[in-house]
Structure formats: structure tokens, C-alpha cells
């Protein structure tokens, strides 16, 4: 017997997975941050689809994709390149900060210090120091050389924290020498610390809404801030005041980029505009471009003649920057200053479509989605695959056409936050073991016509997701018995990411289906998988059946009713109404039946009875008619479907029965 080491005993856990291709070369949602390695022309992009991608900006080809860096399972909000491009640090809504080998693209370590979304990072190049901040109001300082030296055995890291923030932090900046760190938050103020001593220096007031972006001058004397209030402010830290307020945008300013001499501001806004402004003379400004969606981040190209921009959409575009020419001769012989031509799109990294709408069909196996390009797709949740690409068809009409009159309890939820369908299994509001179905309905391709088997969707799926997991210290299988892995019916794609996380909280474990066989992954699963998962995957326990109470009484049109009282019965909710017909014949009318399992009373309790035993020539459903709410019930309907579509009441389901005209129960 395997002894399961319960982890997070006080935390309720959920399991989620993403239905996706083995390699997703395009961003499937907005892109939150950019970092350019100018030495080798690599552009790193942090996606809302939870993936960091690397692009070759030196090629003129449309195929710029190099590789993906995957280990987050929620939006990647910020990234910084460090150690001369050897390493990358990322911050995510999954509450983690991750350290990456930027060249090989793998995650080296995960920092779990934050307790909420990590929104921003700051980097002091000269000191190799990184700061992280987020919605938990915390700021942590990290020594990059220590982080990159972490190993499985040497996995202890210390951090300094900057205290005093009273609200969620959305922006963070340091100068290269690491003498000043500035944070912006929903307090609408700037807080300044000395990261060398972790001492608070000052706070600056002036913005009226969230401070979304910050840049600190190299000497640490000036700060430029952008806010949701639509303004850009320039602050002098020596004077501890705002020395310039710039109004060039109609909506919030979400991204800032400074020229090397700290004289020009390139700003991106929710109003979709990218604008260059002279800091000392804000009236001297020019529009670089109008993007297709609100601008999330900006970054220079290699020679700084253009700027890469990301938005709510998944495309990444590079725009030519206009230059400010002060040496233009005017008609009077004097010198004029003017902007040279800019705003031309010089490169584009195309993104993919994000799923925006999703409908779970009544069979609770398939979902239909509609993406940002109006493409409609059918996904098979149970097999974790895309089933059918329908194209730009009428989404609502497809949902209506494919919905059958069948009721199966919800056993999963769908999250579209990343732009790809993430399926969530749990034991809270939605019980992943609530969906029992007959095998001919759930897996018609696996039907054995000689048996009537009930399957549980949640159990089968968990067994498939963790098929390769062999827990440490488990007892080897008996040589006479097969080593049971998986569910015996189907497998899911091996590249599928599986995530264990706290309900409404942080990620505990992420792995691919195929990697569960690894020693470290197996040990991690053993320590983190909740008991309700190991019960079905390892112990092979059967989830409990859900019961439905119902009343059974004669129909008013019964010519010779044996009784008039109501009988209150309880049966598994997936029992078909033909079983109720058999019960009426055998137990109520005492007629000969063609039972579905020998004893009609047992048929109400046992879902796996045999429907082919010998008996009377006519089956029960051809001799007995069931009514509910003045509607004749299809004998193939199960109890839960009748309750949902016909009964439609919170009180106990009530059936009325009567004999059909061609059957006289007195004449046996």
C-alpha cells in the first residue's frame, strides 16, 4: 500500500491542464513585456499566454521564432535580461519569479516568496541585482549571481525586502548602479528606497491614479512616471518634487522608454498611440504610430532607429522612430527644428488568435470556442485534443445545433485567461467526479456490446493525465497481474501541461504528461498531489455514485391501478428510465418482465446490470409508459436528464406510470 504524504493539508487543491499544440510558435494573447539582447539580436517577449518566446530580429524572414520558454501557468508580466544576456528573470500572475538559462531556454529555479501576482521587475546592471514587486505590496531584492547558482541540493536563497508599501505595486525601476529604487502603486504615489540599505528615502505625490510605468535616470537624480491618469511626470529626487507634467495622451500611460541622453520620452498609452516627446520642451512632440490596441510595452531595436511595441493583441511590431533635426535651414536663413519622417512599420512578428468565448455542451465532454479572429473550434475535453476546426461559422448556431437533450453534471470549468483553453478539475463548487455516463454515450468507440459499463469522466481523465506517474516506494505489481497505468481506454497528448495549484492561490507543481515518469517529478507529485487525486490514480478507488430520490405513482388514466399511494425510491442518477419501467412491471404490477439485470429492484441500484437476460417477449419500455409533468418520458433518458429538462423543480422528481394499450397486466 502506498503511503501518501499529504502536502498543503490545509490548502484545497485543484488540477488544471491546457489543450494546445505541442509547440506554440505564436503568442496567443497580449504581450506584456520585451527585452532585447542587442549582442545577438534576440528579442524576448513575455506573453499573457504564460509563455516567454525568443525571436531572431536580425532576419528579414517572417519566420523569426527561435524557441519558447515554458514553466509559468499564468500571465508573464515582466522580464529582465541579466548577466550579459546569459540569464533571464521573469515575473508572473502565478505568484512566482523564475530564473532561466536564456541561451538554452530552461527554467533553473523558481522563487515563491510573493503571495499574489508579481507585476514588475527592476534590474541594476552594475550590481547584478533584481527587484520584484506585486499585488501583495511586497518588494524583494535578489542577488542574481546567487539565484543562478541555485541547484537541487543548494536551493536556499536569502532576500532583502523593502517595506512601507500600502497598496498593490504595478511598476518598479532601478538605476544601473543600484542606488535608487522606485515603486508605483494604486496609492497613486511614488515611493523611493535606497536598495543598499533598504531604507525608505521619500514618497512623491502628484498622480491621481495608478502609477503604471517608471524609468530612473542613470545618475539616480530623475524619475519619469506614467499613470492611468493620462499624464507623464518628471520628478527631481534632489528637490523631492515634480518638475514637469506632460499631457500628450488621452488615456492612461502604460509604457515608457527613454533616449540614452534622457532627453526624449517615448510613451505608449491605452489610447493606442506611441508618441515621442522632448522632456524639457513637451510641446515638441510627434506621433510615432497608432497601434491597433492599447500599448503594453516598448523596447528599442538593435540600432535604436526603431521601437518594438506590444499591445493587447498578440502581434509584435517594430516602428521606425522619427528623428529630431535641429539643423534645417528656414526661408529667412535661420535654423528650424523639425521631426524627420517616422512611423513606418519595419517589422512584424505575427501572433495567433486568443479564444474569447467558450460554451460547454450538454454532454459535458465537448466545448465550442470562438477566437479573436472569429474562428470556431470544437475541443474534446476528455481526450485533451482539438476535435474539429469549423472556421468562421455562426458560433451561437453551432452551439445550439450540437447541444443534445441530455443532462450531465458539470465536472470541470474552463479558464480562457491565457487565450488557450485551460480545463480546471477540483472538489469545490464543481466536483470532477460527478459525471458518470454509460460507456456507449461517453466512449462509443470503446463499446463492448455484451456489457453495460458506466464510466466516470473525471476518473478517466486524471488517470490519463498521470498515466506515467509511478510513485516512489509503491509496492511492485503482482507478476500475475498487469501493471495498471492509465485508464485502459485512451491516452492524452504527452505534451499536455498539468498544473497542481491551491484553489484561488499559488501554483505548487507544473509538469508535462510525459515527464511524470521522471524521478524528481514523481517525488514532487507524491508530495503535492491531493488525496482525491491519489485515491483514483494510485489506489484505483471508484468515485461514489450520486443518488436521486423520486416518487412513483399510477397515472390517472390507469384502468386498474393496484395502488394509489406514492412510492418513494432512490436510484443512481444515471439510471435510464427503462429501468424504472422494469421496476413498475415486476415490483408494482407483478408482471413478467424482460429485466435489465435479473431483479428490477436491483436495477435501480446497480448501473452495470445486463440488459439481455431472457424473459417476456416485450421489454418493459414497450409495455409501460412513464409520464413526468404531463410529458411522455423517453425510456433512454436517465433520471438526471428528466429532472433537468422535464421536471424542472427543486422538489423530488415524480413519475406517473401507466400500461400501454397493447399490454394487459392482468393477462399474464
UniProtKB/Swiss-Prot annotation:
Top-rank taxon: Eukaryota
UniProt-listed InterPro entries: G-protein_beta_WD-40_rep, WD40/YVTN_repeat-like_dom_sf, WD40_repeat_CS, WD40_repeat_dom_sf, WD40_rpt, WDR48, WDR48/Bun107
Regions crossing the membrane: none
Q: Name one GO molecular function term.
A: ubiquitin binding
Q: Where are the WD repeats?
A: 26-65, 71-110, 113-152, 164-203, 206-245, 248-287, 290-329, 350-389
Family label: Belongs to the WD repeat WDR48 family.
Q: What is this protein called?
A: WD repeat-containing protein 48 homolog
Output the lineage of the source organism. Eukaryota, Metazoa, Ecdysozoa, Arthropoda, Hexapoda
Gene that this sequence comes from: Uaf1
Amino acid at each position: 500500500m502506498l503511503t501518501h504524504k499529504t502536502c498543503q493539508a490545509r490548502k484545497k487543491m485543484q488540477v488544471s491542464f491546457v489543450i494546445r499544440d505541442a509547440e506554440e510558435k505564436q503568442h496567443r494573447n497580449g504581450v506584456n513585456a520585451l527585452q532585447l539582447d542587442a549582442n545577438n539580436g534576440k528579442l524576448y517577449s513575455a506573453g499573457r499566454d504564460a509563455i516567454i518566446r525568443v525571436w531572431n530580429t536580425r532576419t528579414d524572414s517572417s519566420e523569426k521564432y527561435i524557441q519558447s520558454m515554458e514553466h509559468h501557468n499564468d500571465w508573464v508580466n515582466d522580464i529582465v535580461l541579466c548577466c550579459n544576456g546569459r540569464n533571464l528573470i521573469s515575473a508572473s500572475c502565478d505568484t512566482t519569479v523564475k530564473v532561466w538559462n536564456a541561451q538554452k531556454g530552461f527554467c533553473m529555479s523558481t522563487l515563491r516568496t510573493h503571495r499574489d501576482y508579481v507585476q514588475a521587475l527592476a534590474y541594476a546592471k552594475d550590481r547584478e541585482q533584481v527587484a520584484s514587486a506585486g499585488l501583495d505590496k511586497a518588494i524583494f531584492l535578489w542577488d542574481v549571481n546567487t539565484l543562478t547558482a541555485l541547484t537541487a541540493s543548494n536551493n536556499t536563497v536569502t532576500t532583502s525586502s523593502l517595506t512601507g508599501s500600502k497598496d498593490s505595486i504595478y511598476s518598479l525601476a532601478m538605476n544601473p548602479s543600484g542606488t535608487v529604487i522606485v515603486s508605483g502603486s494604486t496609492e497613486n504615489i511614488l515611493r523611493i528606497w535606497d536598495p543598499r540599505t533598504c531604507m525608505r528615502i521619500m514618497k512623491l505625490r502628484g498622480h491621481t491614479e495608478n502609477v503604471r510605468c517608471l524609468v530612473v535616470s542613470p545618475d539616480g537624480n530623475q524619475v519619469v512616471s506614467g499613470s492611468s491618469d493620462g499624464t507623464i511626470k518628471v520628478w527631481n529626487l534632489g528637490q523631492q518634487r515634480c518638475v514637469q507634467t506632460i499631457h500628450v495622451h488621452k488615456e492612461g500611460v502604460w509604457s515608457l522608454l527613454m533616449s540614452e541622453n534622457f532627453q526624449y520620452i517615448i510613451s505608449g498609452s491605452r489610447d493606442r498611440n506611441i508618441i515621442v516627446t522632448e522632456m524639457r520642451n513637451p510641446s515638441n512632440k510627434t506621433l510615432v504610430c497608432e497601434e491597433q490596441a492599447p500599448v503594453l510595452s516598448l523596447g528599442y531595436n538593435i540600432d535604436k532607429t526603431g521601437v518594438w511595441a506590444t499591445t493587447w493583441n498578440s502581434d509584435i511590431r517594430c516602428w521606425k522612430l522619427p528623428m529630431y533635426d535641429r539643423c534645417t535651414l528656414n526661408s529667412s536663413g535661420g535654423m528650424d527644428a523639425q521631426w524627420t519622417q517616422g512611423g513606418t512599420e519595419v517589422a512584424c512578428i505575427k501572433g495567433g488568435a486568443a479564444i474569447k468565448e467558450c460554451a460547454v455542451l450538454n454532454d459535458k465532454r465537448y466545448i465550442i470556442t470562438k477566437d479573436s479572429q472569429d474562428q470556431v473550434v470544437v475541443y474534446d475535453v476528455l481526450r485533451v485534443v482539438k476535435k474539429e476546426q469549423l472556421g468562421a461559422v455562426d458560433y451561437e448556431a453551432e452551439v445550439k445545433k450540437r447541444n443534445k437533450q441530455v443532462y450531465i453534471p458539470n465536472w470541470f470549468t474552463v479558464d480562457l485567461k491565457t487565450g488557450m483553453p485551460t480545463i480546471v478539475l477540483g472538489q469545490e463548487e464543481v466536483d470532477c467526479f460527478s459525471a458518470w455516463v454509460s460507456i456507449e454515450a461517453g466512449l462509443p468507440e470503446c463499446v463492448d456490446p455484451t456489457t453495460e459499463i458506466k464510466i466516470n469522466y473525471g476518473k478517466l481523465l486524471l488517470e490519463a493525465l498521470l498515466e506515467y506517474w509511478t510513485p516512489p516506494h509503491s509496492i511492485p505489481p503482482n507478476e500475475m497481474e498487469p501493471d495498471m497505468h492509465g485508464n485502459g481506454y485512451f491516452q492524452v497528448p504527452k505534451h499536455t501541461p498539468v498544473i497542481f495549484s491551491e484553489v484561488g492561490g499559488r501554483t505548487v507543481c507544473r509538469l508535462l504528461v510525459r515527464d511524470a515518469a521522471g524521478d524528481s517529478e514523481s517525488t514532487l507529485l507524491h508530495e503535492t498531489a491531493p488525496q482525491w487525486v491519489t485515491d483514483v490514480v494510485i489506489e484505483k478507488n471508484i468515485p461514489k455514485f450520486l443518488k436521486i430520490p423520486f416518487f412513483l405513482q399510477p397515472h390517472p388514466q390507469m384502468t386498474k391501478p393496484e395502488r394509489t399511494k406514492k412510492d418513494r425510491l432512490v436510484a443512481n442518477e444515471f439510471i435510464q428510465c427503462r429501468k424504472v419501467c422494469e421496476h413498475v412491471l415486476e415490483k408494482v404490477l407483478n408482471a413478467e418482465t424482460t429485466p435489465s439485470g435479473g431483479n428490477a429492484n436491483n436495477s435501480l441500484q446497480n448501473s452495470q446490470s445486463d440488459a439481455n437476460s431472457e424473459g417476456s417477449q416485450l421489454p418493459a419500455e414497450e409495455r409501460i409508459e412513464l409520464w413526468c409533468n404531463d410529458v411522455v418520458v423517453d425510456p433512454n433518458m436517465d433520471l438526471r436528464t428528466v429532472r433537468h429538462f422535464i421536471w424542472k423543480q427543486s422538489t423530488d422528481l415524480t413519475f406517473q406510470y401507466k400500461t400501454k394499450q397493447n399490454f394487459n397486466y392482468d393477462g399474464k
